[in-house]
Amino acid sequence: MSQAPLHAQAMDEGIGQMESEGQPKSVRREISHVGVVVEDVEEAARKLEELIGIGPFKILEPQYRDLTYQGKPGRYKVKIGLAKAGAIDIELVQILYGETLYDSFIQRNGYGLHHLGIRTDNIEQSVKEMEAKGFRVVQSGNRPGVKWAYLSTKEETGLVFELHEKKDAA
């Protein structure tokens, strides 16, 4: 009989949910994926499957809406590859066109590990909580059933977080 991953057990026990006296409990969050910026999704997916057995990858060109980048309307398109890797997903991201937070990352670091994806059950509240801590939304958008926002916490944690909330498509 297999057990739930440790992070899932901890979330069920309330670990990771902060509570201050007189304040409502924070929303539930858990790591869902690791995002990697790549030059070519198909090639990166092939190599990961061939070299270390992660895959198969599902390749998508999501149709995003209400895009923002640096607080302004955004116009960009990406191709992504998704595969299970144990309890989390690997998300490969290839820029097809437009200006994104991935561009500045590539200019500074080259291709590679970019962000931690964090699933939340209330993205609006999660974003408000992060903004109250001084973090800002760098890029955001949605598609049917999913809303997402990238927050830069690079100076404080060395990481970029992608908060996302998945709802049943209406």
Predicted features by range, described:
Residues S2-V27, V36, G55-G86, L92-H114, E124-A170, ...:
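Vicinal oxygen chelate
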Residues E21, I31-H33, E39, G53-I54:
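The feature marks the first
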Residues V27-R28, V41:
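Onset of an N-terminal alpha helix
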Residues I31-V38, L48, I80, A85, ...:
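Short, structured motif recognition centered on aromatic/hydrophobic residues
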Residues V38-E42, T120-I123:
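Helix N-cap motif at beta-to-alpha junctions
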Residues E42-I54, S126-A132:
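Amphipathic alpha-helical segments
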Residues I106-K128, A132:
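Short, solvent-exposed interaction modules
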